[in-house]
Amino acid sequence: GKGLSGGKLIVVPPKDSTIKPEDNIIIGNVALYGATSGEVYINGVAGERFAVRNSGAHAVVEGIGDHGLEYMTGGMVIVVGKTGRNFAAGMSGGIAYVYDPDNTFYEHVNKELVEYKNVKSRYDEDQLKEMIQKHYQYTNSNVAKKILDDFGNEVAHFKKVVPHDYKRM
């Protein structure tokens, strides 16, 4: 996934695996580094520095390590699990949505260049639902199924992360 420039990347554990994907790192550090386009669906957790310098890829992942989305300039990332510390440091473009049912995301986000708020617009809800449906379709994710089964209520647990400069547009 490093330097992804189109196509679709789907990462799932082996069929005979007994791990719980949403609790295990399944893709290593710096995945999606410098990605410019394409779609990524990861049934599991990514390591550190996920989607650093992403400028156009769209991804759904079930958790990420520290420094995720650092220096991101475009694209969209949906995290349906925990984030590590220093999330979105230097992020100047793109959009992230983070599933935060326990309201602890604020402890991990670097607020220097971004702000986060609850998802309120129909556009955001539709975009989230469409990507999570694809994630479920491609990965059979238990997390995606749980969210989709009660989407009307679960959407309230998402935070939208945008650079301050986006808000000025």
What is the meaning of each model-derived region?
Residues G1-M169:
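Long, distal/terminal scaffolding or interaction modules
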